[in-house]
Amino acid sequence: MSSGNLRAGIFVATMTGLAEMCGEEIEDALGAAGIESDRHVMDGLDTNSLGDYNMLIIVSSTYGHGEIPDNGITLFEGLEAGVDLSGKSYALFALGDRTYADTFCAAGDRWDAVLSACGATRVVDIERHDASSGTLAEDVAGEWAARWAASFV
């Protein structure tokens, strides 16, 4: 897919705002690669918000016991109810903390499962950022997006 017909939507599920900072870095990396994108915090969004994009990029933290952040619940539940995303590609940047081994990046895994079940195709391995790794999530997010975005140009 060339960037000429690629329109990416970056959708952010966050509790503290860190995932939103990651989304900003991903948006910058895509722009540098020549890919048009729009970034949306998931507050109040439903599955209709996905329609304009053929590439979906989900940036999601995990909180509690592997839960989707509150602002992403409506969109997530809409996807769980079933929507046809065949023909759409997606990439996933998950935030978590390995000190919570049982639920590390569990929300990211849940997004992956629901997008796949709706017929979307993941185009790059899930990037799982570990809050206890000593790296800044937003730096890792930008570098991750820059690595694969070049292959779509």
What are these regions (language model features)?
Residues 10-12:
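Non-catalytic terminal/interface segments that mediate subunit docking, oligomerization
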Residues 2-7, 17-21, 29-33, 40, ...:
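FMN-binding flavodoxin-like domain, especially the glycine-rich phosphate-binding loop
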